[in-house]
Regions:
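TPR/TPR-like (Sel1-like) alpha-helical repeat modules
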Residues: 163-168
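Phosphate- and divalent-cation-binding pockets in alpha/beta enzyme and binding domains
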Residues: 158
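Acidic/negatively charged segments and metal-coordination signatures
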Residues: 189
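Structural detector for internal amphipathic alpha-helices that build alpha-solenoid repeat scaffolds
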Residues: 1, 9, 16-31, 39, ...
Length: 190
């Protein structure tokens, strides 16, 4: 069995190639590596936290509740890596935190949260529709894109309503969502 401390040293070496090479070995250790990786998510060094999340993202033993707090990490790169990790571990328990993360000041993190919600799929639809009611435009765009990708008929009313928005981006995602639902017809205002 590889020495855990040596693998963690390589993971946090500051050398991306070396760090990436040890991830399969860490995963080969199974659940034995999890406590050390979780401890690493609390490091003062952003790079260490990022690599811990990167490793946890590919572990089949990662528990969603251990990732959720990392969506509030002070470093946007760690938050983005966490949203990506949650996309690899789709779970309904992450829906509220991911919807909140769609408001992240970092647009990549917000977009990755939307991608994770797409992976969760239909269980996220009701909360996404509710979010459309009062969210700022940037969040509504992400929500509409997410709804368009999920392709759930419950989103039809919000997609139709968004066709009348002034934002061309909202109109685009509304039209795309309707087309993906097989409702690709011309909509004319009376």
């Amino acid at each position: 069995m590889p020495d855990l401390q040596r693998l963690l040293f390589e993971l946090t070496s500051g050398n991306d190639d070396r760090a990436e090479k040890v991830i399969p070995q860490l995963m080969g250790m199974g659940e034995l590596a999890l406590p050390a990786l979780l401890e690493l998510t609390r490091s003062e060094l952003e790079d260490h936290r990022w690599w811990a999340v990167r490793a946890l993202a590919v572990s089949p033993h990662t528990q969603i509740e251990t990732l959720l707090p990392l969506l509030k990490d002070p470093a946007s790169q760690v938050r983005a890596a966490t949203a990506l990790a949650l996309g690899l571990h789709p779970d309904e328990a992450a829906i509220p935190a991911l919807i909140e993360t769609m408001s992240d000041e970092d647009s990549m993190t917000a977009g990755l949260a939307g991608n994770a919600l797409i992976k969760i799929g239909k269980p996220a639809v009701a909360a996404l529709i509710e979010t459309m009611k009062e969210a700022p435009l940037s969040v509504r765009i992400l929500v509409l894109r997410t709804l368009a990708e999920i392709r759930d008929h419950r989103a039809i009313p919000v997609l139709m309503k968004s066709m009348n928005e002034e934002s061309a981006v909202l109109q685009y995602w509304a039209q795309t969502g309707l087309e993906r639902l097989g409702l690709d017809m011309v909509y004319i205002k009376p």
